[in-house]
């Protein structure tokens, strides 16, 4: 079996790279390894970067002029001054012009952290300024910068050569604008095809729902659904109410797949889940007459309602604590046992206060209030 042999010739432009190798330099590498050498030696050439005049070539013609590149193309170019004595650069072509956008980005050395260059972003507009039509062609222009990094190079030499990286910005469905359709249960997606105008495509409602569920910004993070759409839960009416009626109303998976918002109201949430709101408002059945709040003192043959009423009357007539008749609190009465056997016997209750004791309590209360008011 013959093994292919690749010959690397570092001196010519006719050499080929093995499959898988791409030219993807960093911003710092473009400045220090390519642009600096071109500024110091105008005859320097690279097998990956071609020399072109950007003012005489349209953006869609540049891929054919490049030496290599699939989606990004690199070029050496000289700045064309708009005026002989000015510093403004002529960026116009026959079909349009390049317009700068945003701020220039600084490029620092990874070893010395010194400023070595600047990167400017430009967008190509078809037509003439200021009514040009924006296209999807973008260019990154690299130039030398740094007072201490290139102190041995004159200012005119540093501004003479630049490296331009040209690429075509993709604007597909990931960046397409989604607008509501007029009818038919779908949505209209605006997709730009590159050089041509944007086209509007009608998509089904199932696809448009996927577009609408995407968050509009990073601060609005989509919350997970409150219910798992892949799980089918079974709710019955008997589990939601106190009634003994067994009406098996099972919630199907189609009702659960509905997305429940965190801020949905109770009627909308229960309607989406297929549940009956009235089943939650049913009152429990009334307690029977044989219900006893004190099962320890229960008697099977005696009515408990009369016993509980007598206990409340005795409890409401207890004397105040701290009164002069505190001795009556220690006196107790032994209640007789209830009829029928199994009753309560030997229970001690305080005797109700008499009228004289109540008058003494009122006198003590007025005396205490007089002390507070006269203080």
Curated annotation (Swiss-Prot):
GO terms for molecular function: DNA-binding transcription factor activity; transcription cis-regulatory region binding. Disulfide bonds: none annotated. Residues 116-175 bind DNA. Changing residue 375 to A: Loss of transactivation activity. Keywords: Developmental protein, DNA-binding, Nucleus, Transcription, Transcription regulation. Residues 175-228 are annotated as: Disordered. It is found in: Nucleus. Residues 203-214 have a biased composition (Polar residues). Residues 17-169 form the NAC domain. The keyword Nucleus applies. InterPro entries: NAC-dom, NAC_dom_sf. Its main location: nucleus. SUPFAM superfamilies: NAC domain. Residues 215-228 have a biased composition (Low complexity). The keyword Ribonucleoprotein does not apply. Gene3D superfamilies: NAC domain (2.170.150.80). Residues 210-247, 373-375 are annotated as: Involved in transactivation activity. Induction: By BRM and SYD, at the chromatin level, and conferring a very specific spatial expression pattern. Precise spatial regulation by post-transcriptional repression directed by the microRNA miR164. The NAC domain includes a DNA-binding domain and a dimerization domain, and confers the specificity of the transactivated target genes. PANTHER family: PROTEIN CUP-SHAPED COTYLEDON 2, PROTEIN CUP-SHAPED COTYLEDON 2-RELATED. This is Protein CUP-SHAPED COTYLEDON 2.
